[in-house]
Amino acid sequence: MSALLTVRDLSVHAGRQTLLRDVCCTLHEGEALTLIGQSGAGKSLIAQAIMGNLPASLRAGGEITIGTASSRAEDVAARRGLWGRRIGLLPQEPWLALDPTMPVLRQIEETYRYVRQDAGPLSPARLARDALARLGLQGKERHLPHQLSGGMAQRVAFAAVLASGAPLLIADEPTKGLDEAMRNEVVTLLREALLEGCALLTITHDLEVAAALGGQVQVLQNGEQVESGACTQVLSKPRHPYTQALVAAQPKHWAPLPPNAPARLLLAAEGLGQSLGGQRLFEGLDLSIRAGERIAVSGPSGCGKTTLGNLLLGLLPPDQGRIIRHEMRPHGFQKLYQDPVAAFAPRQTLRRSLRDLCALHRQPVARLDGLLDDLGLGAGLLERPPGGVSGGELQRVALARALLLEPSLIFADEPTSRLDLLTQQQTLEVLLRSAEARQSAVLLVTHDRHLARWFSPAQVILDTRSNPDTTADSSHGSDHSVRSLPPGVPPLSAALRTPQAAQHRAPRRAPAAVR
């Protein structure tokens, strides 16, 4: 059987610096290959080189064969003609892949109409509507991309790439930002694509996703393959020290953090309720935040976690209730965005953006180098624009930017969703160490239940319950509204074993509670 993808001796250079060295891989019909490794290790560079859309400042070498079409890695024009029909890409930044001016239903419909063309007797509109419904997006057909949560935008992009019918799928962090139930469904859809004969190249930091997809796995570190083999073998009995450390660094193995110590009140919210697009997200939420406090925020994709943060930060007015803030500095409340690319000026170097920030708020630039060292970032990285660094590196730069202003409250919206497990641990340690030194409160949005439980016993949980129970939680003395956690989502492995579990959907309508 001929291969759908063959990569030989792929290398990528930025001037004299080697970013990727002698990468090789082969994929046949129905096979899966998953790339794991540190942020900035070169995983996305492999996908970009295969697609032929590397940044102009980078130089590629090696040979890439897609089906019967063979070309040198630097001959990008030869592969761009295969986009959509032979290669489908699910990008790491879904908002950048969607037309910001077009409703999502029409975007999927156009893929069926102009790219697929052989989709069968059903109309493109019907196929598009069914595709969105299958991914839990009923009622969102007329929404524009900016009206969707990060997880919803990821699912729309996923529906578009599957609609193309391309035999080779490249999925760059396909489950990033999704709750556990939707992650299970996306993995199930990827496995179905494999059963239908697609070849699948996946980039992920989620080792459970890698294990569920099976096939082969390659581990990259500093642009080189350090280990490869059958997924079950590599993840259960890793040989390379980096792979061993990566497997051991999952949040479920972390020691719990000590409880919060009582401190001065920063913010109090009473009876908060909010709707978006005619949908009630939450209501009756009472919440107080004290200096130095840690609170985890969790719930299904699209349930209002980011909206809650925007309310607390003063970026949106609440539909119901009131918020009293005891921090008066204009930069005292800071946000780490789920998609950091959208939070930086695209044509400025990162250094210029950070220097301008320091000048605006009269902060010493000298602190920047120390923060970069703590976050494992080289100073030379700042000479690039936002598009010239990986998503994980950019998120760490965003964290450095927030810490420069010494905020009283940080709303961290999935700040480690782009990071490998080791870098996630390092980044959260820096965040917590800096927050503790400055008595900054941190609200952490996460879909990882292990990470949420490690971070804090106080959890804001947005789900479908009609109203929160406002009894006190004596276990940690919190004065938040409290309610028990929603029913547990089955493990990914179990969800993939049974059709019933694979079809489980997280509820959509969401009052709020805190545990």
Give each language-model segment a name.
Residues 84, 164, 196, 405:
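Conserved signature/switch motifs of ABC ATPase nucleotide-binding domains
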Residues 158, 186, 399, 427:
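Hydrophobic anchor residue at the start of the ABC signature
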Residues 131-146, 371-387:
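Conserved ABC nucleotide-binding domain
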Residues 71-88, 114, 233-238, 324-334, ...:
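ABC ATPase NBD coupling module
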Residues 223, 464-465:
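Conserved ABC ATPase "signature" C-loop
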